[in-house]
C-alpha cells in the first residue's frame, strides 16, 4: 500500500506541474499576440519614415553625404549589442543567441579587432560577466512587449559610443522570428548606417492564429516605402540636414524592430517549451497510471489469494 500511495502522490504532483506549464503556455501565447499587435501598430510610422529616407537618399544619390552616422572609418573596436531574455524556461532561445555573440567576439579577436559588449537581458549579462568579458552597458527589466522609449534609451548609448569614436562599428546580435517553432540568431551592422540600406525592402508581419485547436503563424508580406517623394518637392531646409535629423529615428526604428522580434522569439520558444512540457506530463501521467493500476491489481490479487488460502486452511 505504501508503494501505491507513493505512485498516487507522484501522479498528483505531475498533474499540478502540468497545470502550471499549460498556464504558462497560454500566457506566452497571449503575449505573442500583443507583440504581433505592436508590430502592426508601429508599421505606419516605419513605412512613412522609410519612404522619406528613401526619397532623400535618392535625391542625394550623387552628393557627398558626409554625415556622422554614415561615416565609415578604420575598424579598431566594435560594440556588440546582444539581446537576450531575463528569464529561462524558453528552450534554447538564450543559449543560441549568447553562443552566436560569443562566436562573433572570437571572430573579431581573430581579426585583431577589439570589442566590447552592450547587453540586454539578465541571461547574457550573467554569462559574459562570469567570463569577465568587457561590458560597456547593461539593460534589464525590459517589457515583454518592447516600447519605443526602451529602444531609444539603448540607441542613445550606442550613438554616444559611435559618435565619440569609442567604437568604430556597432553590431547587433538578436534572434530573428521565423515561426512558432523556429527562430535563428543573426548578426547585423547597426552603425555606421549604410545609405544603400535605406532603400525599400519587402518585410513580413506575423499573425498568431488558431487552427484545429492548435496555434499557428500566418505571415503577411508587406512592402516598405515602395514610393519615393515627388521629385518636384521643395524643402525649406537642406535635404542633407533633414537626412541627418532623421537617421537617428531610423536607427531607433531598426532597434525597436529587433527588440520586438527577439521578444516574439522568446515568447514563442517559451510557448513551445511549455507545450512540450505539458505533452510530456500527459505521457508521464499515463505511464504512472498504468503502473498504479497494475500495482493495485497485484495487491487485490494478493489479498484474494490470502483470503482463499486462509479459507482452505480452516477446512
UniProtKB/Swiss-Prot annotation:
Tagged with keyword Metal-binding: no
Family matches, as PROSITE patterns: ATPASE_GAMMA
Protein's name according to its UniProt entry: ATP synthase gamma chain
Protein localization: Cellular thylakoid membrane
Task of the protein: Produces ATP from ADP in the presence of a proton gradient across the membrane. The gamma chain is believed to be important in regulating ATPase activity and the flow of protons through the CF(0) complex.
Keywords associated with the record: ATP synthesis, CF(1), Hydrogen ion transport, Ion transport, Membrane, Thylakoid, Transport
Single Gene Ontology MF annotation: proton-transporting ATP synthase activity, rotational mechanism
Source organism superkingdom: Bacteria
Gene Ontology cellular-component annotations: plasma membrane-derived thylakoid membrane; proton-transporting ATP synthase complex
Subunit structure: F-type ATPases have 2 components, CF(1) - the catalytic core - and CF(0) - the membrane proton channel. CF(1) has five subunits: alpha(3), beta(3), gamma(1), delta(1), epsilon(1). CF(0) has three main subunits: a, b and c.
